[in-house]
Amino acid sequence: MKKDLQKKKKRATFLLKRRSGLKAAICLAGTFFSALFFFSGCQMEQQSFTASEQTENSSSTSEPMQEPLAVTAAGEVFLLLPDQEAACTATLPEALPHVEKDDFSVQVFEGETLAFSGTAAQLETFVPPQNGLYRYSFSNGNFSYTLMVETAFAPQIFWQESEALLGEALPLSVRYTDAQSVTAETSLSFQPVFYPVDDGWVSLLPIHWNTTPGEYPLTIYAGTSVFELTVTVADRTFEIQNLTVDETTTAQTVENDEANAEWNQIIEPLKAISDSEQYWSGCFLQPVEGEITTQYGMIRYVNGNPTSVRHSGVDLAADTGTPVQAAGKGRVLFAGYLQLTGNTVLIEHGYGLKSWYYHMDSLDVLTDQMVEQGQIIGKVGSTGFSTGPHLHFAMSVNRVFINPWTAIDKGFSWGNRR
């Protein structure tokens, strides 16, 4: 009995200890999970703050969506992506890139050289001047898109127009050719000579004032390419002038054998000179302001002589000593006194295009000197075959004198594709 009582006491003590241990374990577990919950809550709160902060920052610094740019070129539509390049080959000017985005600016590069810069609308009129590889860069301020274009155009003729009045000059150019030379044949009195330039070959075709109006064939050979063209010569009316000049003056000039021989010996050979470089740019200047007393091409009868002569330029009346400007940049072929035309300057502007200045009182330039457009080359006078102070101003393509007002009003550019 005593033993049984001791066993029950031991068991009760064991159970009590077991319950106490379990309670402690439960308390410990509760403490652990409370701590874990607290820690996790802090992490969740921290994560929630970070996500909120990221959302706020993202909304304040959001960038525009990258969208493809549709560019039409070479008969295809290219969907360009920023920082990626596409490439195509254009065999016709009509196949050059086109984009219908008014807010885009465009730059075109040949290597590192900028060939074009403008709007997408202005790009419509741009044609690369020669075959090669061009980088078209489109930008809207946020993204840039690039299209590489290899131009492989067939040889083409460019000119301002196919019709010309008597006394005009037609600028011609052949582009997109690798020909080593370009030649021409025509039934006109002048056979055009072509000169090499960076983007092809160029030439000036003058129409002599005594050409019969009508249509004239013009054949141009550029390597294996042959171009059959038609030049239409239109008529113009030339006024008639009856001029009276002191017989002493005529005897010393136009009727003087020595004066004519001097001209033929010194000046005539200079007409054939053609520098293979274009010195001028844009329109030419009227070299002096003054009243026009005689127009280009006027049919002149002197002192009742039944044989007429043609006036090669325009006469501009001005006071003696009035400065005379160079009509364009060029090289002085002659600056000196001639019995026939007095103090005279002849300037070569390139490709055979020349300007002439007669009857000056004094000269301010020398032979072989380069002059700039607008530079003073002399002063108005009345030397040589002259009836009073004026400047005789003329222009020619080699031996063919042309209307100088065309050079002043329009200039000579190498025209549009035909």
Predicted features by range, described:
Residues T125-L133, I207-P213:
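Surface-exposed, short loops/turns at beta-strand junctions within beta-sandwich domains
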Residues H311-S312, A326-D361, P389-A394:
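Zn2+-dependent peptidoglycan hydrolase active-site motif and core
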Residues P323-L333, D364-V380:
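Short, well-structured beta-strand-loop connectors
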Residues Q54-S59, E63-S105, Q160-T183:
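Solvent-exposed, low-complexity, repeat-rich "mucin-like" stalks and linkers
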Residues N343-E348, Q369-R417:
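Conserved, short, structured surface segments that act as functional micro-motifs
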